Amino acid sequence: MHLSSSNTPSVFVAWQDLASREWHTVARLSQVEDHFELGFTHGADRVGDIARRLFNSTLEQNYYSDQLTALFRNKIPPRSRSDFRKMANWLNLTGDESDFELLGKFGLIPGTDGLLVYPSPKVENGRYSVEFFVHGIRHTHGEAEAHHLHGDVLKWCSEIEPGDSLCPLLDVQNPADPNAVALRAEHGTILIGYVPRFYAADIRTILSRTALARTARITVLKNNHDAPLQMRLLCRFSASVPDDFRALDDSDHKMKAEEAAFL
């Protein structure tokens, strides 16, 4: 069995190195008709024995199963949970989506296992779009307070409304990620946080092309006042792209193997 095509609904798995706090894309999970296919990406090469520790497998094989494994099921809170609807609302969901659709959204919430599950951006009719939580609000605020700079970022977060815009800044001298894209308030110089690392290369590529950058928008979808900071601001980035634009077209997202085995 061959791993799914690029048109198949897919999510990627990212693992956080607690020492460096960097996120590394390590696998892709796809829903293909009545089963699921899991394969490792070249990003997993950066993090040693992650395949064995998390999946009890090797990097050289792909796997399939007829249901979501426990690692992924546990990312989706039970619909019977008392705060399920509240959490779904944080993610701009109705709660009636399929389990795979819920995984692609609830997976954006960091867990104690150090994993995130995030969906592939949509590229349809010449338009690129992706939704994400702003990363690094806590880290940015902590640094700001320590240096007495932009200590009002949390005050700003309390006032932002859905429909408001954020402005991207290409952080070309970022030592952790040369593709880093910082986000600031539309008015003023308040640094809010960052685009998630796994979407940054795409967004940087788009913003680096003047004609495409003019069409780009970063819009606040949800300001979750009752959520932890890492789930505070849900945003959407959208822009016009050429018909041949390929989302997540970098080595970290490329698959290591072609054949699938039973998981």
Predicted segments — roles?
Residues 1-263:
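Conserved active-site motif detector
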